């Protein structure tokens, strides 16, 4: 049986950009509790975005997140011994969480450049509607579309 619902923790906005989304990105980048290192990576990547695009990095980042956020995903559902991939709508907080996760994962997967450059390039690519994170979103949507026949199994 399920226990009670997990409480949603309040997250403090980022000290430099006063934005909760940036704070979430910093937390996603952070490894082993090294927040200062994560902040340095994020801020340097924002400077890089400013340099390359000439636009406000915060706006670019927010638009990139908006572009990567998925609408649908598939969830496994067991029905009489068979497991079906059932397409379901993604809830609001999870949309943002997945978008951040995919952007960071895509940046980490690239090699040969400093992390701040990889992150900035992935954010810029997502802003333009290209890149690995956008590919991931499209794959998830394709999977949901392919399993549309099982939509009636939603719970």
From Swiss-Prot:
InterPro entries per the UniProt record, alphabetical: Ribosomal_uS7 (IPR000235), Ribosomal_uS7_bac/org-type (IPR005717), Ribosomal_uS7_CS (IPR020606), Ribosomal_uS7_dom (IPR023798), Ribosomal_uS7_dom_sf (IPR036823)
Domain of life: Bacteria
Keyword field: Ribonucleoprotein, Ribosomal protein, RNA-binding, rRNA-binding, tRNA-binding
An individual GO BP term: translation
Entry-linked CDD domains: uS7_Bacteria
A GO MF label: structural constituent of ribosome
Stored Pfam families: Ribosomal_S7 (PF00177)
Spans traversing the lipid bilayer: none
Gene Ontology, cellular component aspect: small ribosomal subunit
Subunit and interaction comment: Part of the 30S ribosomal subunit. Contacts proteins S9 and S11.
Entry similarity comment: Belongs to the universal ribosomal protein uS7 family.
Biological function: One of the primary rRNA binding proteins, it binds directly to 16S rRNA where it nucleates assembly of the head domain of the 30S subunit. Is located at the subunit interface close to the decoding center, probably blocks exit of the E-site tRNA.
Protein name: Small ribosomal subunit protein uS7
Gene: rpsG
């Amino acid at each position: 049986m399920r226990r009670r619902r997990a409480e949603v923790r309040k997250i403090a906005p980022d000290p430099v950009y006063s934005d909760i989304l940036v704070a979430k990105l910093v937390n996603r980048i952070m490894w082993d509790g090294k927040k200062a290192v994560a902040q340095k990576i994020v801020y340097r990547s924002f400077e890089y975005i400013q340099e390359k695009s000439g636009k406000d990095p915060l706006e670019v980042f927010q638009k990139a997140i908006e572009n990567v956020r998925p609408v649908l995903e598939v969830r496994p559902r067991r029905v009489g011994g068979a497991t079906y991939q059932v397409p379901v709508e993604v809830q609001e907080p999870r949309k943002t969480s997945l978008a951040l996760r995919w952007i960071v994962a895509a940046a980490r997967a690239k090699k040969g450049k400093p992390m701040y450059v990889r992150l900035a390039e992935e954010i810029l690519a997502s802003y333009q509607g290209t890149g690995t994170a956008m590919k991931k979103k499209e794959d998830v949507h394709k999977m949901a579309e392919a399993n549309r026949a099982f939509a009636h199994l939603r719970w």
